[in-house]
């Protein structure tokens, strides 16, 4: 049967003729050397060019990554080799290497060596640790040397292909070839080594339109691959798959089975002649260089072919070799950290007659099925003996050990535990995939149909594009994974049984209530498995998550692509494998899963009984789960982390609990948060205590001013000055009526202009003193501006109502420290919004507008005649004492509503 490998195009980039291509081992980069003289680096994930080096005006026929140095080395037709740093784009080295066109450069995998071959018929070895000195020259070819490549299994040797129709194998340190392979009828263009360990092969491609596979130990031709219609310009053994790739000037790339040498596939992307093939060990990506651009394809899936049984025994395949490891061999004394690679001893179990594309234990772990090449073979897990085989595109197990195979899109066969065919099903649709488990599932690209194993009857059809299917061991839950999300459904087997046993009809949609949708999660699953009622999976973002009751929890962030193997309950660990067959484990407590499951079911008594068996270090995780379910009280009781408990207590309004945590933690942020909460809930004593602990002076200012607490403001003044919080100290002085202290604070803060303006408004008697200071300070910077400042003692005419302001200040000053009770706020709020100076002037105007007396004289004239007109000072005194309120509650500026003149004339101060 042929290999069935999906081939997907991952990059198609048009450019000048690509003479060589290379893949970066860690970055998603393709290196392409162009006939136009430039070297480009393409990002195949973003489909964009990320770097470009203008090497020369002549063709660049070969370039390679030197990743351990972050370099690109390129050989061109101008006979120079150039080295660039691909991060900084700097040119590291340029030197003339040959006397004719450079055809190929090859980088040694471990040593600081680069080989170059040329049309001058020479091969040269360069050592970059010695300043790119030529340390050896290899002579022997009689025509152009088209390609050189190191032997990956013996890096001290390399092979060269030449147009003299030969391939020569050389050793470093020896100027003469070890041997020569001669078999092509025309020039040899390319050569590559087989990377696997079982065959000492190399392959060559020639202008005679053939590729030949050679055994370099017996020096004989093993196979000739014929089929191309033009020169074979590029060949390679794929490092991960049992295939050979050959590229030709006929525009095609042919894929051959590396064991049977059967032609498996032919690719033609319409970009004219093929010039180069690039690949990388550990990857299934292949890059093809054409006349008109570059193509990258991905052959097959990179999921490792591996399976683990319930006891921890893992079996995997590397090509046709079957190997096994056992997690139990790691003793309990070896403490392996989560995510650390397990030191497993690999044992050879045997070989497989077909190339495995899937491998799976049956439910009890006794048998293992290998499926690939359109066939399946069932082996015993311990001795690796063949028990059964047959044709199958896919193979799936049932939960009780039966199995089904998909022979084609129109035929599915069910077999018993004794490997006997029991039933054949011909679905009325094209079955593209099948899945096993409690029910046998067949799906197309649009829907999935579930059938029972016993009779093959359809149970239910669900319209969804299914990528994978995972059944819980209980058989009651199933996960359907699609491209963008996954669905968790409950299987109502009792409903199905009663419907079928009662003779109910099954329509095109099946039994209506067979499945019940429980949850839909918008995440793309890479691999998954069930542990009880908990679904464990890793997603496309490389996170290891588990889902209980629709609630997703991230266990760990993975540093690379991993694939789930299974869960060992006795170790409480879930195991994963990467594509290099490294196995890692992560702790996932079964008791934690059971607890969450019980909570989701509402069985709180059993959940609480299980709680003591969960380690203390996991209690915060439990608490967060309870919080997500809205069970904050229970979460607070279980949580151990003080920060988390504090947050929960604040959410619940449990201020005493939060206060106890804050006392223990002595965190300013916690005290501040608690103080704000206490203030908002009316617990002002606690708010004051918390704000004092937090040294939140702004909060204390708000609290004391709201309470009218003069004593508190006095204490706050001292605290603010000690901490340099001058704004807070100023406001405290102002509200306490200590205007002189306000001025002094402004002066000490070097805010002399502000002090002058304040004194003009509130303490006019201090203006001359402040102006003198202001002049002295300003003299240092701008003498002319300093001279322009006017002193009211010298120029009273420049200061409106100056004498009245002085009189008002003198009368109000004794009453500044007396505070009106808050109950009188309404009286003061109803007063006109005017200053005392304005009030005095308005009073005079009012007196002048009084109606005339009986004699026809107005009051003002009568007063003048009687000589009893009050002085301005007396008038101010009368205004202050006669307005119906008490003790200086009228401010100097008369703004009774805002109380701006007395530094603590807040009506609310008690």
UniProtKB/Swiss-Prot annotation:
Segments carrying the region annotation (Disordered) are: 865-910
Mind telling me which InterPro entries this protein's record contains? Beta-prop_COPA/B_2nd, Coatomer_complex_subunit, COPB2, G-protein_beta_WD-40_rep, Haem_d1_sf, TPR_COPA_B, WD40/YVTN_repeat-like_dom_sf, WD40_repeat_dom_sf
Localization, UniProt: Cytoplasm; Golgi apparatus membrane; Cytoplasmic vesicle, COPI-coated vesicle membrane
**Compositionally biased spans, kind Polar residues:** 886-910
Report the main location listed first in the record: cytoplasm
The signal peptide, as residue positions, is: none
Cellular compartments per GO CC: COPI vesicle coat; Golgi membrane
Locate the compositionally biased regions of type Acidic residues: 865-884
Query: Which key words tag this protein in UniProt?
Result: Cytoplasm, Cytoplasmic vesicle, ER-Golgi transport, Golgi apparatus, Membrane, Protein transport, Repeat, Transport, WD repeat
An individual GO BP term: intracellular protein transport
Q: Where are the WD repeats?
A: 13-52, 55-94, 97-136, 140-180, 183-224, 227-266, 269-309, 351-393, 461-501
Q: How does it sit in the membrane?
A: Peripheral membrane protein
GO function term, MF aspect, one: structural molecule activity
What does the annotation say about its assembly with partners?
Oligomeric complex that consists of at least the alpha, beta, beta', gamma, delta, epsilon and zeta subunits.
Family note? Belongs to the WD repeat COPB2 family.
Q: What does this protein do?
A: The coatomer is a cytosolic protein complex that binds to dilysine motifs and reversibly associates with Golgi non-clathrin-coated vesicles, which further mediate biosynthetic protein transport from the ER, via the Golgi up to the trans Golgi network. Coatomer complex is required for budding from Golgi membranes, and is essential for the retrograde Golgi-to-ER transport of dilysine-tagged proteins.
Under the heading PANTHER family, the entry gives: COATOMER (PTHR19876), COATOMER SUBUNIT BETA'-2 (PTHR19876:SF68)
According to UniProt, the name of this protein is Putative coatomer subunit beta'-3
